[in-house]
Amino acid sequence: MADRCWIVIPAAGSGSRFGSEVPKQYHLLKNKMVIDRTLSVFLNWEPTYKVVVALSPDDDRFEQTALGSHKDVIRVMGGAERADSVRKALEYVCEYALPSDKVMVHDAARPLLQAQDLDRLWGVRALTSAIFARPIADTLKRSQDGTIQETVSRDNLWGAQTPQMANPNALLRALQTCCDKGISVTDEASALEALGERVSIVEGPAYNIKITRADDLLIASALLEMLE
């Protein structure tokens, strides 16, 4: 049997920084919803077994998506924070996962990934947990009250992306332990790091942007034209 990959997509957030009553994943990107573009790349990628989407309890939009009723898409109730949503989705995954299975956790609002990108991350699955990330290019400043306090060296600094890949049981244990100990985690890798797990970096594509603010849709649209 070929190795299987579960996909977890936390989509319970309100997207307050986007500045719209409609969560960012439900906005249109060139005539398709952002989340449909995100789902599509995974549903058409051969190693994908199932896609588990964590939704807000009051989400009434997902059922209107083109791919929300796909036979390989499973809905679970999300939590208040991203880590809570991922943990709830992983509880489902771990109930059915095989020992050799992996999981990739991916932002609903990163719709531009290509199958060949997933292949590169999948290629290191036997060795380690791994994430996509990009080297920091901008000069970094630490500020207080709108004033620069210091310039921070960007040596060895990377900006984390998704997907982030791990063994589903190991990731669930890491997230649960961090929750129990009150350790704040901002992505899956930080939970694994907190437990001393080794997480490798695979350089992600520059176009793997996260739609966070309204003008990101314009950037994503331009990038999509390039990719098509």
Across the structure, where does each feature detected by a protein language model lie?
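N-terminal glycine-rich phosphate-binding loop and ensuing alpha1 helix
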Residues: 2-60
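Conserved beta-strand scaffold positions in the cores of enzyme catalytic domains, especially
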Residues: 26, 75, 129-130, 199-201, ...
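Acidic helix N-cap motif at the loop->helix transition within catalytic regions
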Residues: 60-66
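Short phosphate-binding loop-to-helix
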Residues: 67-101
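Acidic metal-phosphate-binding loop of nucleotide-sugar-dependent transferases
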Residues: 82, 108-112
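Short aromatic-hydrophobic micro-motifs that form the base-stacking/packing surface
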Residues: 102-106
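Conserved core of the sugar-phosphate nucleotidyltransferase
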Residues: 113-202
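Hydrophobic helical membrane-anchoring modules
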Residues: 208-228
